[in-house]
């Protein structure tokens, strides 16, 4: 799962000498969590061995979820609110991009248009998106041993005010209107691969 991948990335930090008791902030980013609620961050926190209570943030979004988590972890330390934080990002896209998940949509499109382009669209995404995770510990001071780096700034800027957003999961634009998965039937969700 995406949660397990994130925890394994954090376990790598632990194996490298990170003490989870010295951390007080955890920021997790993912595009497609394993569950709708609760947030990915608390799911990850619950699986970190011997972790104390943390401030936890879950960042979502397609391409920027991991960097949004990194920015939160960075700001948590930069402002002095926390001495040490963890930023982790994980994705497990393979579980949702399997062909059988799109069979109803393919069949519906064949009926509607007799054009099977959906197969190419979904295959493209399946091969472009991969599973993986990475984690980093941020601290108010450099490491005593080993590699350290300093973050000078992180800018996350949206241009959704100028360009249409893309890569929906759980929604689509239909006839120039936003349609949420919550407002359609189960059959329509399957026929349009909204989830």
Indicate where each model-derived feature is located.
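Condensing-enzyme catalytic core mediating Claisen C-C bond formation in acyl metabolism
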Residues: 1, 115-195
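Conserved catalytic cysteine-centered active-site region
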Residues: 3-4, 31-83
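Phosphate/pyrophosphate-binding loops at sites that engage ATP/ADP/AMP, CoA/4′-phosphopantetheine
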Residues: 9-24
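Glycine/charged-rich beta-loop-alpha catalytic/anionic-binding loops adjacent to active sites
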Residues: 22-25, 48-59, 115-120
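Short beta-strand segments
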Residues: 29, 60, 85-91, 138
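Acyl-CoA/ACP chain-elongation machinery
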Residues: 81-103, 159-167
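Short, flexible helix-coil linker/hinge segments at the edges of structured domains or between repeats
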Residues: 96-119
């Amino acid at each position: 799962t995406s949660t397990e991948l994130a925890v394994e990335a954090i376990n790598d930090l632990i194996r490298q000498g990170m003490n989870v008791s010295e951390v007080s902030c955890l920021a997790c980013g993912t595009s497609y969590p394993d569950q709708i609620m609760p947030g990915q961050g608390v799911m990850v926190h619950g699986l970190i061995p011997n972790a104390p209570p943390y401030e936890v943030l879950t960042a979502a979004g397609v391409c920027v979820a991991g960097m949004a988590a990194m920015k939160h972890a960075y700001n948590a330390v930069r402002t002095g609110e926390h001495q040490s934080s963890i930023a982790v990002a994980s994705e497990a896209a393979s579980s949702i991009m399997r062909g059988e998940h799109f069979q109803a949509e393919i069949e519906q499109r064949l009926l509607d248009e007799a054009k099977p382009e959906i197969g190419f669209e979904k295959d493209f995404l399946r091969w472009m998106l991969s599973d993986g995770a990475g984690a980093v510990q941020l601290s108010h001071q450099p490491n005593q041993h080993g590699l350290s780096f300093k973050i000078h700034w992180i800018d996350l800027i949206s241009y959704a005010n100028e360009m249409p957003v893309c890569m929906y999961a759980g929604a689509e634009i239909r006839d120039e209107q936003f349609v949420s998965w919550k407002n359609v039937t189960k059959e329509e969700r399957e026929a349009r691969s909204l989830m």
